[in-house]
Amino acid sequence: MEKTKEKAERILLEPYKYLLQLPGKQVRTKLSQAFNHWLKVPEDKLQIIIEVTEMLHNASLLIDDIEDSSKLRRGFPVAHSIYGVPSVINSANYVYFLGLEKVLTLDHPDAVKLFTRQLLELHQGQGLDIYWRDTYTCPTEEEYKAMVLQKTGGLFGLAVGLMQLFSDYKEDLKPLLDTLGLFFQIRDDYANLHSKEYSENKSFCEDLTEGKFSFPTIHAIWSRPESTQVQNILRQRTENIDIKKYCVQYLEDVGSFEYTRYTLRELEAKAYKQIEACGGNPSLVALVKHLSKMFTEENE
């Protein structure tokens, strides 16, 4: 019986394990460790929280890739192109509940409440993102930021929220988490359309092929209401390199990349201020600095 159970588990988790062996940046783990400078959570609890966050993050990537019709993840074929859509959906959902099971081992009455709230947030944000894309509705910058805070903030909030349950540090970290959530996502949007590293790792400008409204394209659409070029390119879900290169040049010409860099610099400065106000945190500052290189160095 045990053997059969083990085999079933192996089959169920294979798509998830496939994703795990792809090289990742482990940003969420580094973030939790950096926040522990303040929170001083016991090591055993911290490990469980880090594991839960990584599980949920990776499971959500499996689903994301299906919802976005992605071809590559970190330069490798997406899981559903190997295992098929049904198995991958099931595997990802299974991992969500394994995460919940792990949260129960934390043995804190509020842990499951928090887990539920943050996963609801994550799905609300994701749902809006998909709705805008599939109905060709361009959100305003404010609407986009609110969605990002639900989507990225969902998992950031979960890790730090769970840590705070086991900490005597009671400062409100939400403003800083929000700043970091926006910083991470807008940086990602920028990298997808502008950075060398990304085009080697993801198919070139994948956000354009996906038809996704991202920070630079939203700026271009609202700042040039008389032109519908960007909307039309997004609507095509194009894989044509020339059209994508043209779109990137257009975003450059209308100042969307410049505006995105400006926004990232503002968020970076705001994060340092908020970190200072919470009593300083060298490892968190180092993490933000490291992530900022991408949009400062290439323009020096």
Curated annotation (Swiss-Prot):
* Ligand binding (Mg(2+) 2): D64, D68
Q: Which reaction does it catalyse?
A: isopentenyl diphosphate + dimethylallyl diphosphate = (2E)-geranyl diphosphate + diphosphate; isopentenyl diphosphate + (2E)-geranyl diphosphate = (2E,6E)-farnesyl diphosphate + diphosphate; isopentenyl diphosphate + (2E,6E)-farnesyl diphosphate = (2E,6E,10E)-geranylgeranyl diphosphate + diphosphate
Any single GO BP term = isoprenoid biosynthetic process
SUPFAM superfamilies according to UniProt: Terpenoid synthases
Q: Gene3D superfamilies this protein is in?
A: Farnesyl Diphosphate Synthase
Binding site residues for Mg(2+) 1: D64, D68
Q: Which GO terms describe its cellular component?
A: cytoplasm; perinuclear region of cytoplasm; Z disc
Q: Which family does it belong to?
A: Belongs to the FPP/GGPP synthase family.
Name of the protein in its database record: Geranylgeranyl pyrophosphate synthase
What is the organism lineage in this UniProt record? Eukaryota, Metazoa, Chordata, Craniata, Vertebrata
